[in-house]
Amino acid sequence: ESFTGLTSLRLNEGREFEEELASVEELLMEYEEAGIESPLIGFDFKKLLEEKHKEIVLKDELLRAVEEDRIIPFFQPIYDIKTGKANKFEVLMRIKQGDKYLPPFQYIQIAELFNMIESVDFIVISKALEYKKKIDANDEVELSVNISGLVLHDYKFLNKIVKKVDELNIKHSN
């Protein structure tokens, strides 16, 4: 007799962490009652569920940040040693939370995991371009923006960026 209960094990976003843990424990008991050795002996379900729960919490935080327009581009100057002037800026993503700005690393991972990275990258790029348009009347400042490798080869995404650059009358070289 085969036991297929394991295939239905997944973290449901609508359920509480404790419910998920209880579900796993119940599944393991069913294995034991059926006299089947669990292939999951030694696997730390609590840790896995804690990680998945954290991912969902971060995803919800990221969604709220998008909805509340709290994704902010930061501009890190890149100085020309010869002139001592910043002629380029690297655009970095931050998430505004109260009076603080959160670093993006874990949120970028979450955006990639939940297929939100295209939206997040485009928000950062759009805001950076709009700010550049306001402060750079002569269109001389160059921006360097890091985008996810997951969207780098997506022609629709790249065309959206080109369209935004054209809409703002910014030179493609900058």
Task: Give residue ranges: language-model regions.
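Catalytic-site/binding-pocket detector for metal-dependent nucleotidyl cyclases
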Residues: L48, N115-M116
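Catalytic core of bacterial c-di-GMP phosphodiesterases, primarily the EAL and HD-GYP domains
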Residues: S8-R10, G14, E18-L21, K85-K88, ...
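Catalytic-core segments of nucleotide cyclases and related cyclic-nucleotide turnover enzymes
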Residues: L9-I36, I56-K59, F105, L158, ...
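Active-site core of bacterial EAL-family cyclic-dinucleotide phosphodiesterase domains
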Residues: D44-I110, N146
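Conserved helix-loop-beta segment at the catalytic/binding core of cyclic-nucleotide signaling proteins
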Residues: E1-F3
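Flexible, glycine/charge-rich interdomain/linker segments that couple
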Residues: T7-N12, E30-V57, F74, E140-I147
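Catalytic/regulatory signature loops of cyclic-dinucleotide turnover enzymes
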Residues: E20-F45, D60-I72, K132
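Nucleotide second-messenger and two-component phosphorelay signaling modules
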Residues: A34-G35, R64, E68, D80, ...
